């Protein structure tokens, strides 16, 4: 029996005519439907998704080919509903846009958000503006926004552990659109958004953005400034050494875009601060992530003796090992007394490069993030692999065996 996606359009008919488009498109992908019928219905969904450790982002058309497209569509509906309910844009006739004003495209990005063990946490749909179509001096100026340094994160987590401080994480929902837009920006209707249900012609209308959507060049700066002003108004001072660390008498806050870590010795300081955000004039919308167990893909766990903690990135290591093509169940790992900083290069390194079916530069990027975040012992081999402009797969395979053995 063929599987079809069925969902009820919301937003006063905003997506009414799109339902048929989605159903027709998904039904045309017979193989995807067969996978959904024969696999997902016979296995627990978590058994399949835990095996597929993908971290790919999908476009609108690619999302429709996925066996769990129905879950992505629900996330898309929620994303659109959140934007409309918070007046992030205004639908206006195309003729009302200033003469000669360039409208930018809207882009959907879909991704499966996972727990550290690989299970799916949620299906994420993100509506972005095509910032590459903006014009400097017309609809944007300054764009730079700082991000927290991992040195600050590690240092403050160590301090929190030593002093037995309270830690808590919060995640701002639709963070960028919570910031005002200083100049008007006009955007085409996103894929899946149709006005036919309202008796209007979609081609005759555009969106006038009221807030800083994701993708806009100035979006990150506008959001950072809004959050910074809110923290300063609550008695926090920006750290001299790191502009994303804010300090008050009772609390320290680490800010990484829309993810924050709250650290305090006072048991009531964190709840009081969260309440002030909920009731404040900024109208912040966020979720309380509870105690800090995972942050930015890095898992933290206290040592059994209670005198320290470990930081690990198991999902990233999985991606590196699988990208090279190793089977984690059968590949021989390396776990010996030779330090990871031991040089990997030898006299044959200048020989012809070996061909491989994986992206060498992508792996270098992942290794760079891994060694800079939780595995400083990999700095030397990562540096040596990165110094080569051509693929030397024997180096990468040797390093991956080390990763597999020191999981």
Task: Label every PLM stretch briefly.
Residues 3-407:
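Long, low-complexity, charge-biased intrinsically disordered regions
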């Amino acid at each position: 029996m063929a599987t079809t996606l069925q969902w009820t359009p919301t937003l006063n008919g905003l997506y009414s005519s799109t339902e048929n488009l989605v159903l027709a498109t998904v039904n045309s992908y017979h193989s995807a439907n067969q996978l959904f019928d024969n696999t997902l219905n016979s296995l627990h969904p978590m058994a399949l998704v835990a095996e597929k450790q993908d971290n790919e982002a999908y476009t609108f058309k690619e999302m429709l080919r996925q066996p769990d497209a129905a879950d992505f569509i629900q996330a898309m509906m929620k994303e659109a509903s959140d934007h409309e309910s918070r007046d992030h844009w205004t639908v206006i006739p195309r003729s009302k846009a200033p003469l000669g004003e360039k409208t930018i495209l809207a882009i959907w990005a879909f991704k499966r958000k996972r727990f550290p063990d690989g299970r799916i946490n949620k299906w994420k749909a993100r509506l972005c503006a095509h910032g590459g179509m903006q014009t400097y001096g017309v609809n944007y100026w300054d764009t730079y926004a700082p991000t927290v340094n991992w040195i600050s994160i590690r240092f403050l987590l160590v301090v929190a552990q030593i002093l037995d401080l309270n830690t808590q994480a919060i995640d701002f929902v639709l963070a960028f659109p919570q910031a005002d837009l200083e100049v008007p920006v006009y955007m085409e209707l996103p894929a899946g958004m149709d006005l036919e249900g309202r008796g209007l012609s979609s081609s005759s209308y555009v969106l006038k953005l009221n807030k800083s959507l994701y993708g806009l060049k100035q979006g990150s700066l506008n959001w950072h400034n809004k959050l910074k002003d809110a923290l300063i108004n609550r008695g926090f001072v920006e750290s001299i050494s790191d502009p994303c660390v804010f300090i008050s008498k009772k609390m320290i806050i680490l800010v990484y875009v829309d993810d924050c870590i709250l650290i305090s010795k006072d048991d009531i300081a964190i709840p009081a601060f969260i309440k002030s955000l909920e009731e404040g004039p900024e109208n912040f919308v966020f979720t309380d992530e509870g105690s800090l167990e995972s942050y930015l893909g890095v898992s933290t766990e206290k040592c059994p003796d209670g005198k320290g903690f470990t930081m690990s990135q198991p999902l990233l290591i999985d991606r590196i090992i699988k990208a090279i093509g190793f089977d984690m169940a059968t590949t021989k790992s390396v776990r010996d007394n030779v330090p990871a900083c031991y040089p990997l290069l030898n006299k044959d390194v200048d020989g012809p490069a070996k061909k491989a079916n994986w992206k060498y530069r992508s792996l270098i990027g992942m290794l760079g993030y891994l060694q800079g975040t939780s595995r400083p012992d990999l700095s030397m081999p990562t540096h040596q692999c990165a110094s080569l402009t051509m693929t030397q797969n024997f180096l990468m395979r040797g390093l991956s065996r080390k990763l597999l053995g020191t999981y």
